[in-house]
């Protein structure tokens, strides 16, 4: 829905076929509006218009690739990925070879467009180790070729200075197998000269900026561009281009393609030779005869070049400063003047670089070409230099613009002229659309008899004095009345004055505009003459790569035949290219340059309008609006879509046209969408075609399911028959096997029964002579004797009856160890039982008290260890012997548990007073020892808890309930010499009386309740503490410190 909205947007439609009203102004306004939104792609039907934004845009992400993969061309926004996907699917699904023609001015973004197409095809094709390797090699050919074939021009920082056509070959699944690259007319004159504001080829700057110090030393180069005469010193560094990083990327790309390190080194050595040739300086001198000659001014550069290529410096110097002229059967060595020497030096540099570039392309082809014998489909991608109009246009611009005229001719013939002619041939009603046919311009240039290239070749081969003046004169004579040719002389003949046209220039009215060409250098560049002495010198070099570039230098193969001229070679190459393109289904990407300053997102309407006019976009829109988007012969159309109708599927016995009519009638498409020609079916709207293709895909899926069902059924039947046959065979063999096993088992059983019977008879006969159970009886006897001996020995060596003695004799035999341990345990339990039976009730009570004390104080209070050896007597006052104390016992009225003398700590001043403590089963009594009168009688139920310290003191704090009678005076602080026994008996008595344990706190600091409030008691271990009685000190009204020793 989003894409459809974009295509139908009234302000900026995505497809110019839908533009209403259609005019140059509305078309230009639409392109500008879309460009301002960042939408640089627009459709004219299936033609993509691309406007160069001169900045990166976030529209080439993997998510975008996924969005356009296998998608309807018009179901998504206009994008270069859409035409790449459409071409790829046509190649894969329709088995039609494709070519993608990318045209436009220099700087319009053609090279980037070709890389985007290649990267998209690589992304959507299948994955796999071998396939990924091929795709990576195809993609990595771009950085290598760009380094050696691209340069900065006035209009483009990365202008292709050669034409590149790549045929990518695929298998039937659409996986890339490899490819072949063809290159056309490298601008080798750029090696020796280029205009101000431009640069030489990228590789020179990359090598000097990115080469390591070791590499540059090996190539005898300096990292300073100003040192080399062939480099433009003013523009050596290009903003926004990292030459060092690009050099590393080129090296990585070469490794991926498969260049060996030795090949890379050899390639860079030859490149360095070209660069250093520009530093070879010549000076004028005179021979003895008075003839002018030349000599090398600075021999160092010559020596370094000679070292790089493995050639004697004198041989190279002789080749640069002289030439051999053959007169009949004699060879004469002629000295060259300085100008002739420089011409030879530059010609050598141009030829070395040009042939090195050809070798580079062939070497890449060696790595990426497909092995012969494989069936393959082809997608061609053409990236060639765009139309060029400079201030001074020479031979290179003439050749480049001729190539662009041929590409425009293809576009005209295949999209405008041929399409309209086809409608007439097929009898389709059609209103002709006027358009400019540039055949007249192509004929002006390439006519084999009177074309400009033919006249240039004739002038180059003509004997006598040959120069550009005779060439321009001949052109003026032949094309004096030609509508597309102008010169100073032809205009003067028509009485037209044009001061902008110099004498040695001619002007051609190209489809892209008028271009004025300066004929200076035409003959020289067309001849491309290289002295044979230089070729032979290169052949004599020991450098393997350089030697292979000059096979004509072999003295054993002399040839007097002149090599073909540059113009004739290029004309033949273009003809081959055009033939190749005509054999494929074309897909067009028309690139437009929005401004001349390479400014990001700047749109210059006048410049764009000029390109819209000469690219014929208006005519293209008119033809598309009036024409049909798809046409195909009836037979392949019916073969492809016949499964959509039950009447034509699976076989149609009638004619192909009748079958197509029956098929489309059943599908019920609108009549205006279809037209039936004499031999072809025509479909007007791409949407109708996409709907047809969508139905076919659904039907193919259904048929595939049907075929799978039938195949699975056939497989199941075959599998069943095989399993049934196998089951019968296995059953037969198994039954036989079972019968044989049964027979063997029966035989073994019979033999076994016979053996047992014979044995039984024999044993019965001789039983009285054998003692079969003697061994068992003997072993049982020995076992019983050993057990008896063990028990008797144990009886004699029993350990003492002391409970603390846990010794036990070891087992004499290993098999008795478990029994020995069990007897040890039984004996110890019996010994403990006997010990308990001997105890008196008083001893039992004391042991229980000791156990309770252990549970309360062990590892918690230091005094506990001293109480272990002290018996718990309970009564320490001698109440029965002392009559004075007997009346105290009467006060208690219940059973006495413990009686002892204690010290009571005064709550007011912390001083201690002696008291007698009597603990009975229900009360605790404190009495005056002198008067033997009770001072306090406490019920055990009134005791809330007790607190003691961790040290070895006898301090005890009894916490009383506030609600009790004695509790009103506060808690009690007592010092007992038998603290452990006192607390233990108090705990046991409380358990017996109330079934509740005594809450006991063992801490150095605890809180007590006195009449005047709570007091924090802190027990401190100190040398100042008293011996048996602690020292109590009050620290204010709420703190008390007790020092213990």
From Swiss-Prot:
UniProt binding sites for ATP: 104-111
A Pfam family: IQ
Domain (Myosin motor) ranges: 11-697
SMART domains for this protein: IQ, MYSc
Tissue expr: Intestine.
GO biological process: actin filament organization; actin filament-based movement; endocytosis; endosomal transport; sensory perception of sound; transcytosis
CDD domains in the cross-refs: IQCD (cd23767), MYSc_Myo1 (cd01378)
Domain IQ, residue spans: 701-727, 723-750, 746-774
Single Gene Ontology MF annotation: microfilament motor activity
Annotated Gene Ontology cellular component terms: actin cytoskeleton; actin filament; brush border; cytoplasm; lamellipodium; lateral plasma membrane; microvillus; myosin complex
Region (Actin-binding): 574-596
Domain TH1: 861-1044
Keywords: Actin-binding, ATP-binding, Calmodulin-binding, Motor protein, Myosin, Nucleotide-binding, Repeat
Function (record text): Could play an important role in morphogenesis and function of intestinal microvilli.
Family under the similarity heading: Belongs to the TRAFAC class myosin-kinesin ATPase superfamily. Myosin family.
Protein name: Unconventional myosin-Ia
Lineage: Eukaryota, Metazoa, Chordata, Craniata, Vertebrata
């Amino acid at each position: 829905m989003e894409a459809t909205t974009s295509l139908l947007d009234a302000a900026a439609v995505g497809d110019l076929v839908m533009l209403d009203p259609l005019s140059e102004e509305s078309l230009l306004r639409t392109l500008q509006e879309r460009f301002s939104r960042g939408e640089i792609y627009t459709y004219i039907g299936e033609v993509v218009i691309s406007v160069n934004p001169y900045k990166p845009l976030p529209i080439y992400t993997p998510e975008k690739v996924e969005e356009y993969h296998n998608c309807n061309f018009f179901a998504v926004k206009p994008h270069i990925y859409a035409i790449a996907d459409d071409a790829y699917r046509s190649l894969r699904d329709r088995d039609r070879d494709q070519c993608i023609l990318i045209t436009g001015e220099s700087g319009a973004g053609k090279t980037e467009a070709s890389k985007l197409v290649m990267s998209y095809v690589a992304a959507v094709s299948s994955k796999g180790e071998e396939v990924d390797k091929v795709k990576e090699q195809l993609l990595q050919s771009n950085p290598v070729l760009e380094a050696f074939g691209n340069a900065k021009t006035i209009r483009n920082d990365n202008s292709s200075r050669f034409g590149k056509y790549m045929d990518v070959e695929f298998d039937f699944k659409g996986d890339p197998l490899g490819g072949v690259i063809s290159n056309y007319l490298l601008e080798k004159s750029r090696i020796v000269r280029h205009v101000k504001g431009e640069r030489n080829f990228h590789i020179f700057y990359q090598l000097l900026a990115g080469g390591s110090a070791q590499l540059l030393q090996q190539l005898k180069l300096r990292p300073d561009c100003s040192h080399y005469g062939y480099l433009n010193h003013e523009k050596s560094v290009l903003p926004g281009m990292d030459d060092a990083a690009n050099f590393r990327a080129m090296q990585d790309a070469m490794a991926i393609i498969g260049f060996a390190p030795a090949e890379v080194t050899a390639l860079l050595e030859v490149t360095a030779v070209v660069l250093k040739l520009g530093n070879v300086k010549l000076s004028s001198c005179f021979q003895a005869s008075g003839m002018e000659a030349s000599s090398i001014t600075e021999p160092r550069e010559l020596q370094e070049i000679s070292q790089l290529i493995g050639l004697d410096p004198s041989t190279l110097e002789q080749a640069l400063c002289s030439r051999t002229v053959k007169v009949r059967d004699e060879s004469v060595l002629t000295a060259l003047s300085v100008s002739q020497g420089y011409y030879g030096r530059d010609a050598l540099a141009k030829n070395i670089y040009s042939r090195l570039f050809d070798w580079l392309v062939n070497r890449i082809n060696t790595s990426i070409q497909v092995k012969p014998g494989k069936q393959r489909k082809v997608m061609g991608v053409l990236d060639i230099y765009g139309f060029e109009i400079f201030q001074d246009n020479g031979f290179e611009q003439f050749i480049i613009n001729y190539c662009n005229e041929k590409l425009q001719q293809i576009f005209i013939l295949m999209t405008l002229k041929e399409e309209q002619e086809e409608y007439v041939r097929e009898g389709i009603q059609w209103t002709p659309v006027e358009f400019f046919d540039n055949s007249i311009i192509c004929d002006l240039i390439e006519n084999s008899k009177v074309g400009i290239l033919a006249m240039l070749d004739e002038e180059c081969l003509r004997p006598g004095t040959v120069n550009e003046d005779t060439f321009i004169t001949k052109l003026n004579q032949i094309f004096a009345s030609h509508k597309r040719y102008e010169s100073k002389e032809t205009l003067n003949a028509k009485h037209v004055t044009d001061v902008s046209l110099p004498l040695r220039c001619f002007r051609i009215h190209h489809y892209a505009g008028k271009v004025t060409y300066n004929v200076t250098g035409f003959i020289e560049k067309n001849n491309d003459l290289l002295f044979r002495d230089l070729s032979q010198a290169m052949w004599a070099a020991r450098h393997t790569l350089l030697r292979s570039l000059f096979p004509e230098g072999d003295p054993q193969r002399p040839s007097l035949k002149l090599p073909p001229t540059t113009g004739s070679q290029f004309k033949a190459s273009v003809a081959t290219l055009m033939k190749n393109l005509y054999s494929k289904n074309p897909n067009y990407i028309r690139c437009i340059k929005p401004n001349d300053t390479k400014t990001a997102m700047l749109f210059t309407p006048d410049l764009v309008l000029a390109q819209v006019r000469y690219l014929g976009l208006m005519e293209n829109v008119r033809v598309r609006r009036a024409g049909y988007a798809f046409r195909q012969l009836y037979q392949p159309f019916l073969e492809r879509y016949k499964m959509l109708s039950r009447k034509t599927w699976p076989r149609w016995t009638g004619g192909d046209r009748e079958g197509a009519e029956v098929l489309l009638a059943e599908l019920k498409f609108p009549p205006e969408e279809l037209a039936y020609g004499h031999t072809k079916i025509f479909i007007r709207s791409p949407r109708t075609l996409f709907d047809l293709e969508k139905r076919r895909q659904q039907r193919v899926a259904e048929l595939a399911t049907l075929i799978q069902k039938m195949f699975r059924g056939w497989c199941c039947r075959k599998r069943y028959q095989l399993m049934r046959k196998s089951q019968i065979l296995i059953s037969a063999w198994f039954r036989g096997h079972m019968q044989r096993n049964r027979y063997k088992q029966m035989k073994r059983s019979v033999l076994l029964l016979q053996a047992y019977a014979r044995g039984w008879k024999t044993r019965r006969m001789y039983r009285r002579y054998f003692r079969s159970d003697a061994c068992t009886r003997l072993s049982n006897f020995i076992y019983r004797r050993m057990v008896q001996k063990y028990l008797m020995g144990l009886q004699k060596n029993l350990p003492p009856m002391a409970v603390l003695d846990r010794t036990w004799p070891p087992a004499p035999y290993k098999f008795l160890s478990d029994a020995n341990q069990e007897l040890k345990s039984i004996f110890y339990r019996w010994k403990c039982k006997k010990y308990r039976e001997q105890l008196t009730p008083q001893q039992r009570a004391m042991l229980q008290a000791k156990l309770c004390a252990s549970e309360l104080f062990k590892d918690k209070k230091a005094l506990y260890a001293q109480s272990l050896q002290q018996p718990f007597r309970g009564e320490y006052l001698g109440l029965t012997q002392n009559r004075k104390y007997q009346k105290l016992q009467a006060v208690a009225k219940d059973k006495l548990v413990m009686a002892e003398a204690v010290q009571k700590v005064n709550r007011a001043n912390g001083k201690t007073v002696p008291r007698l403590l009597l603990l009975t089963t229900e009360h605790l009594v404190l009495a005056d020892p002198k008067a033997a009168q009770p001072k306090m009688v406490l019920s055990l139920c009134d005791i809330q808890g007790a607190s003691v310290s961790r040290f070895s003191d006898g301090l005890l704090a009894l916490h009383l309930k506030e609600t009790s009678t004695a509790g009103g005076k506060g808690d009690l602080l007592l010092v007992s010499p038998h603290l452990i026994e006192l607390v233990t008996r108090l705990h046991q008595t409380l358990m017996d009386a109330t079934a509740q344990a005594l809450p006991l706190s063992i801490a150095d600091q605890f809180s007590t309740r006195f009449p005047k409030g709570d007091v924090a008691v802190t027990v401190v271990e100190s040398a100042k503490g008293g011996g048996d009685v602690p020292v109590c000190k009050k620290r204010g009204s709420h703190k008390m410190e007790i020092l213990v020793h």
